[in-house]
Amino acid sequence: MGITGSLTPDQLDFFHSQGYLVIESFASEDEIRGLRKRMDELLNQFDCSVSSIFSTKNQKHTTDNYFFESAEKISFFFEEKAFGDDGKLKQPKQLSINKVGHALHELDPLYKDFTYSSKFSSLASSLGYRRPVVMQSMYIFKQPGIGGEVVPHQDNSFVYTDPQSCTGLWIALEDSTLVNGCLWAIPGSHKNGLVRRFIRGDNGITFDQPSPSYEQKDFVSIEMKAGSLIAIHGDLIHQSFENLSSKSRHAYSLHVVESDGCKWAKDNWIQRAKMPEPLYVLP
């Protein structure tokens, strides 16, 4: 099938030089409203007696079968600070979930329609993909008051192919600001290559190298209006701080890899019985 790329030469130049690109008004108000409404429905149906705690600081969830099995399911992960000393939720479950993942784009019809729409195919085509596959999808809440920090990282660490091919696509479903925990990145850091990998072995998952230290002065804040999308190169160093405000920061995030000539690593944390359906296939 023929796919027409949606990015201009200037946009592509910025992406390749800086390692990221913000596209405003990527999602319409109706699409945002629909995605958020559907997530409310999923949360209301969710049995919170079966779940896991998510943290990028403490990787204890990585030995959790619930986490492994989420690769091909719609699974719910609590914020670290959602529970009191008595082990009970300190607020309603709707305000306690860190994220929902990792197969929304396959298993929920509304999220699948949005993910497999022509706008994502056009974007992937502009970025040079021939047979792009969405390996994971996440709805991220960044809850008010307890939304956890996401430490500096590279997406290729977690979503690794040989050769490397990951691009993160992150859509703001609410305004993302300095107040509620917007993204930060080190422009051009993707040119330095991959620092470390997150590897699944017999004893769970660990990083193969310690985390480097980064100077906060090297990061720039990336504030975004609801409906905007940021494309993130797989080697770009990026992070977000805790959300200590009274406002949430909902987002829908995808990680795309090339399946034409790129091999999915057997020691990635995501190991699936079947690869997802590609967004499109070029001849």
Swiss-Prot record:
It catalyses: phytanoyl-CoA + 2-oxoglutarate + O2 = 2-hydroxyphytanoyl-CoA + succinate + CO2. PANTHER family: PHYTANOYL-COA DIOXYGENASE DOMAIN CONTAINING 1, PHYTANOYL-COA DIOXYGENASE DOMAIN-CONTAINING PROTEIN 1. Pathway: Lipid metabolism; fatty acid metabolism. One of its GO terms (biological process) is fatty acid metabolic process. Signal peptide: none annotated. It holds the Pfam family PhyH. Belongs to the PhyH family. 2-oxoglutarate binds at residues 99, 138, 153-155, 170, 240, 249. Fe cation binds at residues 153, 155, 238. Disulfide bonds: none annotated. This is Phytanoyl-CoA dioxygenase. The keyword Electron transport does not apply. Its EC number is 1.14.11.18. Disruption phenotype: No visible phenotypes under normal growth conditions. Its cofactor is Fe cation; L-ascorbate. It is an enzyme of class 1 (oxidoreductase). Coiled coil: none annotated. Converts phytanoyl-CoA to 2-hydroxyphytanoyl-CoA. It comes from Arabidopsis thaliana. Keywords: Dioxygenase, Iron, Metal-binding, Oxidoreductase, Vitamin C.
